[in-house]
């Protein structure tokens, strides 16, 4: 599933070139809330496209006893996570569908060091290509803006 591109592989292997011609094709996906043995469908999209994002926020590390001598990327990353919660609410219309989920965060691996960089990552999901593009763009803009406001830089 994740990155397997099943439909793409089927097309590359010639499934659409066979005789007799394919009239209908259905993609299927597990749906845990549906009872076993049931198949469900409806007109229009059912599942969203998905993309991942990875962010590195660079600051200046140092000892946690002297945070005033650092530019703390962990604080900037935490602020970015909070700010990203507004991306869908303020950029996706009420009749559209989009999700931005931050699912990863990392920084120092010890208790007394402010790291030079912190990382966050997650997924973006949307039913429409134009919504996906808007969300990708806004995630980058928001993260870079928050990083800059904290004196850091960000790579998205």
Feature annotation, model-predicted:
Residues 1-115:
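Histidine/acidic-residue-rich, glycine-tolerant segments that coordinate divalent metal ions
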Residues 76-79, 134-142:
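A non-catalytic, amphipathic alpha-helix used as a structural packing/dimerization or gating element
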Residues 52-56, 119-121, 155:
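Beta-strand secondary-structure signal
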Residues 111-137:
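A conserved active-site cap/scaffold subdomain adjacent to cofactor or substrate pockets
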Residues 50, 115-119, 149-152:
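Short gly/pro-enriched beta-turn/loop segments at secondary-structure junctions
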Residues 1, 5, 151-156:
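Short, intrinsically disordered, charge-balanced linker/junction segments flanking boundaries
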Residues 91-94, 149, 153:
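Short, polar/charged, Gly/Pro-enriched helix-capping and turn/loop motifs at alpha-helix termini
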Residues 87-88, 140-150:
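A common structural junction motif
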């Amino acid at each position: 599933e994740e990155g397997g591109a099943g439909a793409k592989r089927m097309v590359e292997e010639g499934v659409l070139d066979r005789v007799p011609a394919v009239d209908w094709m259905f993609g299927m996906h597990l749906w845990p809330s549906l009872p076993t043995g049931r198949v469900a469908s409806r007109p229009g999209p059912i599942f969203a496209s998905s993309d991942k994002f990875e962010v590195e926020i660079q600051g200046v590390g140092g000892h946690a006893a002297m945070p005033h001598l650092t530019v703390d990327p962990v604080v900037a990353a935490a602020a970015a996570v909070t700010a990203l919660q507004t991306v869908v609410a303020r950029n996706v219309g009420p009749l559209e569908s989009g999700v931005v989920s931050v699912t990863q965060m990392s920084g120092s691996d010890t208790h007394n060091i402010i790291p030079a960089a912190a990382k966050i990552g997650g997924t973006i999901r949307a039913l429409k290509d134009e919504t996906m593009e808007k969300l990708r763009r806004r995630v980058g803009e928001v993260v870079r803006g928050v990083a800059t406001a904290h004196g850091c830089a960000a790579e998205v």
